[in-house]
């Protein structure tokens, strides 16, 4: 497959994710308007993370890494019948597994809450238990959506699977608007039911197109099928690795419940902004590359094949860096403008915007490492190596726990600030752990494929360009400081984006030049 085709697939993934994330930002703005950083916001944010463990453990990332490589190879070999059998068998396994886990999760919710929200007591704890139990079945449905995504992606039908969460977001938005007259503690109960409805709708919009792609599929629990065994072997390793990542997130959440009211809601709000570049550029490129890398993968001892894989990986890393470097710089320098424009409304105050900006800046520390790491992990999965990412994820977990505890609980006291500000240290320390994991992923893959990574000269040019653009944007921010948040953001962020593209074009950075030339051709100038 050509680089142009790969970019086209990444563009489709990015377009789908952009639709989903934009509606996600609208959902978060409506949520922030009604709840701010209140106890109710903390409760729903924490509750949503508990069943999401199930989705992340068995859902999109794990199924993509274990199912797509095997399924895509069968399609490439024109074995449609075998591919259909595999799809049906995996669907049957998921149906059985998820039903059992959802039932156990609902029953064990009180015990789970002691682990991931030890700071919640009394009415706050009881309401969180109720919300978690409502949400669990919906999250099980989302795992089926991930199965749909695996099939659609393998057939290079990228847009629908990543745009489908739009209906999930719409369901939540409409629920909040319809029942906005209720008190916050009652509104979040209705919101939980609206979330479950959204999960069902997200699955249904993908179901029809998927069934057309697998005409011979039958739901059959065929555990003896050799291809099912291959998926199962990879699935276990990836699921454990993904579980480690989720445990890392739960460690952060458990610590944040000890930081006072608003900490979890603040981290969730910052995460909604942080996930936009991660999804648009990191996930889009990694997800679109996995089927192609899987088709290319074979014996990495073959020098020619190793060279092709390395070149493909490096090209993806350069594309990620071009967009993620300015995103991280924006979090550091312009996060206040961004957060205020998105969420400063109703119960969400200017003070809340500054607090979320600080958390967002902390998350910027590991933004590049986490997005690079996704593509490296996809390359390992394409090579059918799930153990290496697992080992490195365990290292990351250990550092996340140690650094997170120290940063969140000890540093605020050392600097004489409120304990709530420990959330900033929590996100920054997670970023440091992410860099350690990325270094380990890269070092081992380099020993197998040869040198990989982005040239330091290119990285330096990108950071300098982002820095110059940030200075220009800060100047505009100062000049227009009396304007409202949305108007201010339009001018400041436009200046930042244009200045960054101008600087990278002056540097003659390949991706920028190609984008400008493509735009010029479409406008029929030059």
Predicted regions and their residues:
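Membrane-embedded alpha-helical bundles of multi-pass transporters/translocases
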Residues: 1-526
């Amino acid at each position: 497959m050509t680089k142009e085709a790969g970019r086209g697939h990444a563009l489709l993934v990015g377009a789908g994710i952009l639709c989903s994330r934009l509606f996600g930002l609208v959902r978060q703005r409506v949520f922030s308007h009604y709840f701010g950083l209140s106890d109710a916001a903390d409760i729903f944010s924490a509750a949503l993370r508990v069943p999401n463990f199930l989705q992340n453990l068995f859902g999109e990332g794990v199924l993509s890494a274990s199912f797509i490589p095997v399924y895509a190879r069968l399609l490439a070999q024109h074995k449609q019948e075998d591919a259909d059998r595999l799809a049906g068998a995996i669907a049957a396994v998921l149906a059985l597994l998820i039903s059992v886990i959802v039932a156990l999760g609902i029953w064990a919710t009180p015990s789970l809450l002691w682990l991931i929200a030890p700071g919640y007591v009394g009415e706050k704890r009881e309401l969180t238990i109720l919300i978690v139990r409502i949400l669990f079945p919906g999250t099980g449905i989302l795992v089926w959506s991930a199965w749909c995504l695996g099939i659609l992606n393998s057939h290079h039908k990228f847009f629908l699977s990543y745009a489908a969460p739009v209906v999930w977001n719409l369901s939540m938005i409409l629920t909040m608007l319809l029942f906005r007259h209720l008190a916050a503690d009652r509104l979040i109960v209705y919101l939980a039911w609206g979330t479950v409805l959204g999960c069902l709708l997200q699955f249904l919009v993908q179901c029809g197109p998927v069934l057309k792609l697998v005409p011979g599929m039958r739901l059959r629990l065929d555990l003896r099928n050799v291809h099912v065994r291959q998926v199962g072997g990879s699935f276990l390793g990836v699921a454990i690795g993904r579980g480690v990542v989720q445990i890392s997130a739960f460690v952060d959440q458990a610590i944040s419940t000890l930081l006072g009211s608003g900490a979890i809601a603040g981290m969730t709000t910052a995460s909604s902004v942080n996930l936009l570049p991660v999804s648009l550029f990191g996930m889009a490129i990694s997800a679109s590359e996995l089927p192609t890398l899987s088709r290319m993968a074979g014996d990495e001892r073959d020098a020619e094949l190793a060279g092709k894989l390395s070149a493909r990986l490096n090209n993806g890393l350069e594309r990620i860096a071009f967009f993620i470097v300015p995103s991280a710089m924006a979090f550091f320098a312009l996060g206040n403008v961004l957060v205020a424009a998105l969420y400063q409304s109703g119960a969400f105050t200017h003070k809340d915007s500054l607090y979320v900006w600080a958390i967002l800046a902390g998350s910027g520390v590991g933004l590049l490492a986490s997005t690079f790491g996704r593509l490296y992990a996809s390359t390992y999965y394409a090579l059918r190596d799930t153990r290496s990412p697992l080992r490195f994820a365990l290292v990351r977990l250990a550092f996340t726990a140690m650094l997170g505890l120290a940063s969140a609980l000890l540093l605020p006291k050392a600097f004489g600030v409120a304990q709530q500000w420990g959330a900033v240290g929590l996100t920054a320390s997670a970023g440091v752990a992410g860099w350690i994991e990325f270094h380990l992923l890269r070092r081992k893959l380099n020993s197998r494929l040869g040198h990989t990574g982005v040239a330091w000269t290119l990285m330096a040019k990108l950071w300098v360009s982002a820095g110059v653009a940030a200075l220009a944007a800060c100047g505009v921010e100062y000049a227009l400081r009396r304007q409202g948040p949305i108007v201010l953001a339009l001018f400041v962020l436009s200046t930042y984006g244009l200045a960054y593209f101008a600087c990278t074009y002056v540097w003659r950075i390949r991706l920028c030049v190609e984008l400008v030339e493509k735009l010029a051709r479409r406008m029929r100038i030059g």
